[in-house]
From Swiss-Prot:
Misc. remarks from the entry: The sequence shown is one of two non-allelic alpha chains from dog.
Source species of the chain: Canis lupus familiaris
One Pfam family it belongs to: Globin
Protein name as catalogued: Hemoglobin subunit alpha
Keywords, sorted A to Z: Acetylation, Heme, Iron, Metal-binding, Oxygen transport, Phosphoprotein, Transport
Gene: HBA
Summary of subunit composition and partner proteins: Heterotetramer of two alpha chains and two beta chains.
Tissue and organ distribution: Red blood cells.
Chain positions found as N6-acetyllysine: K16
Cellular-component GO terms for this entry: haptoglobin-hemoglobin complex; hemoglobin complex
Domain Globin per the UniProt entry, residue ranges: 1-141
Length: 141
């Protein structure tokens, strides 16, 4: 459960990210593919070389979904229902991959915003990504 302090940290951090969210999403996907090569199996039709246009475009989709989630912190299941359906029923993404991407998102944000990435912000973002992952995998059960 996200506390009021968590919600403040998440919204504040996302505001600071601003127009870079799509770039960071692409970078986090690059990190995920490089660090956890098994995640590439879901993208056989993509050019998975670092910085490819397809990875950047999908990273922007990830970032846009997270931006939607940030705007609906009190109703993540409602805000992400269609995305949950897509990943569970059509794409059938192994739930562990959400944890791997979440880790890479945290690393990417910490690299770009080291001053703002305090222990409290880190904890809040970790809880947020875990909550999003839980929603995205909720229809697997």
């Amino acid at each position: 459960v996200l506390s009021p302090a968590d919600k403040t940290n998440i919204k504040s951090t996302w505001d600071k990210i601003g127009g870079h969210a799509g770039d960071y999403g692409g970078e986090a996907l690059d990190r995920t593919f490089q660090s956890f090569p098994t995640t590439k199996t879901y993208f056989p039709h993509f050019d998975l070389s670092p910085g490819s246009a397809q990875v950047k475009a999908h990273g922007k989709k990830v970032a846009d979904a997270l931006t939607t989630a940030v705007a609906h912190l009190d109703d993540l299941p409602g805000a992400l229902s269609a995305l949950s359906d897509l990943h569970a029923y059509k794409l059938r993404v192994d739930p562990v991959n959400f944890k791997l991407l979440s880790h890479c998102l945290l690393v990417t944000l910490a690299c770009h915003h080291p001053t703002e990435f305090t222990p409290a912000v880190h904890a809040s973002l970790d809880k947020f990504f875990a909550a999003v992952s839980t929603v995205l995998t909720s229809k697997y059960r």
